[in-house]
């Protein structure tokens, strides 16, 4: 009773019989990318139905049949709308839901070989298509592969394939060590089951063991050499009148001797570069289809081997074969066989059917897999789409996880460590982060951080053994050196050289190297920040006005601040970071990015002021422009007589001789020498420096544009994949080198990078260590605790917000964070820097983001047409440590670094500022303000939040950002960290303006793609709940088979391809129709 289909009581009214033209029309219906359904159903255990219950059901069924046509129509229409699970889906649930400790099935490479005549003489198996994710065809010219494209299948071919699986031989988990043994096993099985006549065994075996010709990539010279051969072969094929006839084909199969079959891969297979697209554990699925003249009925076999075996030259690439599908049929249906081969090959590349093929126990499991595929396909009308058009692979593939989870029984399966969305009842944040859970014990968080990071300490060094790490080191090194020089110069101006460029280099090297070696998150880069610089300026002026020793006062502030930071570490105060939502993070990171962009242009404008452009210069009037050095009035000479002047092109003479010697020409002096020795510059062209500003802007914008272009070169169609990846990894270094060479070739005297050449304190009034007592009153040591509180807030906010941004879930970090451990080492380094009078260092947001971007990893083997998948970041300690060691050694590399133009480094600053804004939701929402509604992207928050509410949220964020910018630009910048803290309060106040539903989508740190995934899971659960309630109220118990639509091949074709006979009377009977249709 279980195998009987539910009767379709409307089948008796079926009077239309398909004619031949309608059957042919099925071939023009094409199937595109299938979209997974989102419903699933919980399995229910039902007790067996008793005799009385069966009678009751029969009575209900009879009453149902006696209803009026109107009632039947109403009920049928309502029942159609109910989401029902097909028997195929139910069977797949049990297949995929079984607990299996074995590893996931490997990636499959599927190859379609067709039996074709070669040079009009010999029949061979010729490769015509291949699949990993997408289909690649051998073009009609036969000399090249097509671009990867989405496989479009005729609906008819899928039904024919289903019939093949029903009628053919299914051989699962067989053992074979060679192709002849496997072929003999298949043929013997066909004879035993009565599907093949014994006298045809030799012919079938010979056909299946014919030579395989693969479409391998040839070199240009080889391709040119084969042109003549191809042309001559083609001419013989078209001039031979007997080519393709049955007699000729039979003679081809019997005239030549059987080729030697080798189990080892051939040289062409081993040299095939296509292996780079396959993972190491890949297996092969071979599809062989063809037409022969000695068969009256098709020869069909589907084989799955117990262990994958190398079958010689059967496959284009040297991978072991696990699956083999064979279809040999009578003459006249080559196109149908080809489409069936494409259908099974496409199914083998489908992730769900791929898993079913590995786990299937019998024929019915495989048929259920085909039915599930049919349940998910989308049919395109033939009049609205040309099947000859090749569909480009999408940039992002629909995940098959939903289809698999729907059947495997997993309801709360989380991918890539994702956490379920809170359902709109919270504002996001980091409450689910293990690193931020408060322990309630003394130093509990610090101890947990150490225990979490200790097992990865060794791997943090050998994980850096990759060429990508070298590019990251060079890129971040140049950024760090530039930053150290910039802040060192500003500190020198603010503190009267008590801290200068050399102190900045030394502090950066010491602090950064120690932090990267021992901190919890070594991907974070330490640097001086703007608020620290403002504090240093105010502290120096305060000390100067009150006659305090600046360095001693600063020492005690640093010690108090370090002590307060250690208290925060001991009390697990870093748990407060969980209140830093996307609103706070994006406001802070966007502000720092804008500062980098602003400073880059500010420095270029300042350079243009120093080297002005003479906009009134006229080429034809050169005589109007002059600049001459004239001697000063002798009465005003104040230079001592023993001063000697030595321009490089003049003999050495005393100043007295210079001023009184009438033959001395002052016009030979340079501008610098003229000003140095008291001369006067006269002329309207003295402040004009030709070409420097224009050349500097060329270098500046050129470096930025080149860096952006080369970074995106990975997705370019030019050059092989390895070369594109290498260029992308070294994009910044290549840009710097290119424009350094351009600057050297042009020869314009652009400003260059200046590095201290001597290792000594910038100011002669200080040493390398600061004594804690001596210059200031004793009470200053205690009073320093007050400004230290402000510094502590500054350090805590800068450090922890940057750490939160670095540890975002979209970076897919696997070794965990270490907020408490990071703050601990920042406190220790504050003590060291305070004792040595070095600048204080804290996490730098933009440089840290650039460091992460330079270490991002993607899949090494991507199927043709498939976009590389982001795997995570190369977490290690080597790149940061070497960056800071090189920074310390930069003093000894000054002769090399002096050739780098400063505009090139400013261009790198601009790139870092712009690149760190990529993927920030705040920037996406800013762009929405300029986009018409119809052109707006499909962001998840636009699905659920009204657009005016989105704009209001963006406006408030822009307002906060503007206030922070104004605050940063004034004297009140010292309270900048407090205002960052105020962003948390502003975000809390938004609870009164926005609903929790809106905030859950606008203010969340979960990446967009993950949020969409979670939304689809929520919809699936809702449908599941409604499905269960529908099933509880239905009359049909779940244990019985649910009706499904089946289109049998015998009804679709008057002459099925599997049999030359016409449908029997039984197949035309109403009973037969009832068994193959549904209500």
From Swiss-Prot:
Effect of residue 582 to Q: Strong reduction of the sodium-dependent ion transport activity
Membrane topology per record: Multi-pass membrane protein
Listed result of changing residue 1003 to N: Abolishes interaction with CA2
Catalytic activity: 2 hydrogencarbonate(out) + Na(+)(out) = 2 hydrogencarbonate(in) + Na(+)(in); 3 hydrogencarbonate(out) + Na(+)(out) = 3 hydrogencarbonate(in) + Na(+)(in)
Region: Interaction with CA4, residue numbers: 748-779
Positions of post-translational Phosphothreonine modification: 49, 249, 254
Gene3D superfamilies xrefs: Helical hairpin bin (1.10.287.570), Mannitol-specific EII, Chain A (3.40.930.10)
Sequence ranges on the Extracellular membrane side: 492-501, 543-550, 610-692, 746-779, 837, 895-901
GO molecular function, one term: identical protein binding
Name listed for the protein in its UniProt record: Electrogenic sodium bicarbonate cotransporter 1
């Amino acid at each position: 009773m279980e195998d009987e289909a539910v009767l379709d009581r409307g089948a008796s009214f079926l009077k239309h019989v398909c004619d031949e033209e309608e059957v042919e029309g099925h071939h023009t219906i094409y199937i595109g990318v299938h979209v997974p359904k989102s419903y699933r159903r919980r399995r229910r255990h039902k007790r067996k139905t008793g005799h009385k219950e069966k009678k009751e059901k029969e009575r209900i069924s009879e009453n149902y049949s006696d209803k009026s046509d109107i009632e039947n129509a109403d009920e049928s229409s309502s029942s159609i709308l109910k989401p029902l699970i097909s028997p195929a889906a139910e069977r797949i649930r049990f297949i995929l839901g079984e607990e299996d400790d074995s590893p996931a099935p490997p990636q499959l490479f599927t190859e379609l070989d067709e039996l074709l005549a070669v040079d009009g003489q010999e029949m061979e198996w010729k490769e015509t298509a291949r699949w990993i994710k997408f289909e690649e065809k051998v073009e009609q010219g036969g000399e090249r592969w097509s671009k990867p494209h989405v496989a479009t299948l005729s609906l008819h071919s899928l039904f024919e394939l289903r019939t093949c699986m029903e009628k053919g031989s299914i051989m699962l988990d067989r053992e074979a060590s060679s192709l002849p043994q496997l072929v003999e096993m298949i043929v013997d099985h066909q004879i035993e089951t009565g599907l093949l006549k014994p006298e045809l065994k030799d012919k079938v075996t010979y056909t299946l063991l014919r030579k395989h010709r693969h479409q391998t990539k040839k070199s240009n010279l080889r391709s040119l050499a084969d042109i003549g051969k191809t042309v001559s072969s083609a001419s013989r094929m078209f001039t031979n009148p007997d080519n393709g006839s049955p007699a000729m084909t039979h003679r081809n199969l019997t005239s030549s001797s059987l080729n030697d079959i080798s189990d080892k891969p051939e040289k062409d297979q081993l040299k095939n570069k296509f292996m780079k697209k396959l993972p190491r554990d890949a297996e092969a699925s071979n599809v062989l289809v063809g037409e022969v003249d000695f068969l009256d009925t098709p020869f069909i076999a589907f084989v799955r081997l117990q262990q994958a075996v190398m079958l010689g030259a059967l496959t284009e690439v040297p991978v072991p074969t696990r699956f083999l599908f064979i279809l040999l049929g009578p003459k006249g249906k080559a196109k149908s066989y080809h489409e069936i081969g494409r259908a099974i090959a496409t199914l083998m590349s489908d992730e769900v059917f791929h898993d079913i093929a590995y786990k299937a126990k019998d024929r019915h499991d495989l048929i259920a897999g085909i039915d599930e595929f049919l349940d998910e396909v989308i049919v395109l009308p033939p009049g609205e789409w040309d099947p000859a058009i090749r569909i480009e692979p999408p940039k992002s593939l629909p995940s098959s996880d939903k289809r698999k989870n729907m059947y495997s029984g997993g309801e709360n399966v989380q991918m890539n460590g994702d956490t379920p969305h809170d359902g709109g009842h919270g504002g996001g944040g980091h409450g689910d982060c293990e690193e931020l859970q408060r322990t309630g014990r003394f130093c509990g968080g610090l101890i947990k951080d150490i225990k979490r990071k200790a097992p990865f300490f060794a791997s943090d060094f050998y994980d850096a053994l990759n060429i990508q790490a070298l590019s990251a080191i060079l890129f971040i090194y140049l950024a760090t050196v530039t930053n150290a020089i910039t802040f060192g110069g500003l500190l020198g101006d603010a503190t009267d050289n008590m801290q200068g460029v050399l102190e900045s280099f030394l502090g950066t090297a010491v602090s950064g190297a120690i932090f990267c070696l021992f901190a919890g998150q070594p991907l974070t880069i330490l640097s001086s920040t703007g608020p620290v610089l403002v504090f240093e300026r105010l502290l120096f002026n305060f000390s100067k006005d009150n006659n305090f020793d600046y360095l001693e006062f600063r020492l005690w502030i640093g010690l108090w601040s370090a002590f307060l930071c250690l208290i925060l570490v001991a009390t697990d105060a870093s748990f407060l970071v969980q209140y830093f939502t996307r609103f706070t993070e994006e406001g802070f990171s966007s502000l720092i990015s804008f500062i980098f962009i602003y400073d880059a242009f500010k420095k270029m404008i300042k350079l243009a002021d120093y080297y002005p452009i003479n906009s009134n210069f006229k080429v034809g009037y050169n005589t109007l422009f002059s600049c001459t050095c004239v001697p000063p009035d002798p009465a005003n000479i104040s230079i001592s007589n023993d001063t000697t002047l030595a321009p490089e092109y003049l003999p050495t003479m005393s100043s007295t001789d210079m001023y009184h010697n009438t033959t001395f020409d002052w016009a030979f002096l340079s501008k610098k020498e003229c000003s140095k020795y008291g001369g006067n510059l006269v002329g309207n062209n003295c402040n004009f420096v030709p070409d420097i500003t224009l050349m500097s802007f060329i270098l500046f914008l050129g470096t930025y544009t080149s860096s952006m272009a080369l970074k995106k070169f990975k997705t370019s169609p030019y050059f092989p994949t390895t070369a594109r990846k290498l260029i992308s990894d070294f994009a910044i270094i290549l840009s710097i080198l290119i424009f350094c060479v351009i600057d050297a070739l042009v020869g314009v005297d652009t400003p260059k990078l200046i590095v201290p050449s001597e290792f000594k304190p910038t100011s002669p009034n200080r040493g390398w260590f600061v004594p804690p007592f001596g210059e200031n009153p004793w009470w200053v040591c205690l009073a320093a605790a007050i400004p230290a509180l402000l510094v502590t807030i500054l350090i805590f906010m800068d450090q922890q917000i940057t750490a939160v941004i670095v540890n975002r879930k979209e970076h897919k970090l696997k070794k965990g964070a270490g907020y408490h451990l990071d703050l601990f080492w920042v406190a220790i380094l504050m003590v060291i820097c305070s004792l040595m009078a070095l600048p204080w260092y804290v996490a730098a947001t933009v440089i840290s983001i650039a460091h992460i971007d330079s270490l991002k990893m993607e899949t090494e083997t991507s199927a043709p047409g498939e976009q590389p998948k982001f795997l995570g970041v190369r977490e290690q300690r080597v790149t940061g440590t070497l960056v800071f060691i090189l920074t310390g050694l930069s003093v000894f590399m000054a002769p090399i670094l002096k050739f780098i133009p400063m505009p090139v480094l400013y261009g790198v600053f601009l790139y870092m500022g712009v690149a760190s804004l990529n993927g920030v939701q705040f920037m996406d929402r800013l762009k929405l303000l300029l986009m018409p509604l119809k052109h707006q992207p499909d962001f998840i928050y636009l699905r659920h939040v009204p657009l005016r509410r989105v704009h209001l949220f963006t406006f408030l964020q822009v307002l906060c950002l503007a206030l922070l910018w104004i605050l940063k630009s004034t004297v009140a910048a010292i309270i900048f960290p407090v205002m960052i803290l105020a962003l948390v309060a502003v975000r809390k106040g938004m609870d009164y303006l926005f609903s929790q539903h809106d905030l859950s989508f606008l203010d969340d740190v979960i990446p967009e793609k993950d949020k969409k995934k979670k939304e689809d899971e929520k919809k699936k659960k809702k449908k599941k709940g409604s499905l269960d309630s529908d099933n509880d109220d239905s009359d049909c118990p779940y244990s019985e088979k649910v009706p499904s639509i089946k289109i049998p091949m015998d009804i679709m074709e008057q002459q099925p391809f599997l049999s030359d006979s016409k449908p029997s009377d039984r197949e035309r009977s109403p009973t037969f129709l009832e068994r193959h249709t549904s209500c």
